[in-house]
């Protein structure tokens, strides 16, 4: 499958998911982005259009694998959410399948105390 077609499919899935979920200041959207090398996460207040907290795999240091790095990103975003007074979030998988790095990030965030 060509890269452009895969990206178009992911963007369609993301638009479909985004129609249903919305972040508020009390329960922001935990948005995930995956590049080939790194994993990024943001807590977004969609009403104000502001990012409340962010973390990425460049900050967590060395990891054995990209999945392990994503789990550490989840734990880091959960700790930053606690610092900002956020306990709950809406998980936005960004059109990616809930598998591998995306699932590891979600599990790490849950292990860090974030609820969704």
From Swiss-Prot:
One Gene Ontology term of the molecular function aspect: structural constituent of ribosome
Segment forming the signal sequence: none
Gene3D superfamilies: 3.30.420.100
Family matches, as Pfam families: Ribosomal_L18p (PF00861)
Cellular-component GO terms for this entry: cytosolic large ribosomal subunit
Keywords: Ribonucleoprotein, Ribosomal protein, RNA-binding, rRNA-binding
Domain of life: Bacteria
CDD domains attached to this UniProt entry: Ribosomal_L18_L5e
Function: This is one of the proteins that bind and probably mediate the attachment of the 5S RNA into the large ribosomal subunit, where it forms part of the central protuberance.
Subunit structure, interactors included: Part of the 50S ribosomal subunit; part of the 5S rRNA/L5/L18/L25 subcomplex. Contacts the 5S and 23S rRNAs.
Family designation: Belongs to the universal ribosomal protein uL18 family.
Full protein name: Large ribosomal subunit protein uL18
Organism phylogeny: Bacteria, Bacillati, Actinomycetota, Rubrobacteria, Rubrobacterales
């Amino acid at each position: 499958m060509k890269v452009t077609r895969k990206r178009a499919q992911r963007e369609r899935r993301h638009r479909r998911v985004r129609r249903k979920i919305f972040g508020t200041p009390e329960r922001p959207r935990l948005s995930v982005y995956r590049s080939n090398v790194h994993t990024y996460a943001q807590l977004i207040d969609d009403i104000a259009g502001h990012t409340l907290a962010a973390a990425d795999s460049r900050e967590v240091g060395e990891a054995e694998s990209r999945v392990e790095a994503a789990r550490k990103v989840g734990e880091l975003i959960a700790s930053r959410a606690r610092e900002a007074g956020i306990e709950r979030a809406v998980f936005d998988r960004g059109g990616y399948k809930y598998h591998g790095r995306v699932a590891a990030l979600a599990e790490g965030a849950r292990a860090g105390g974030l609820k969704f």
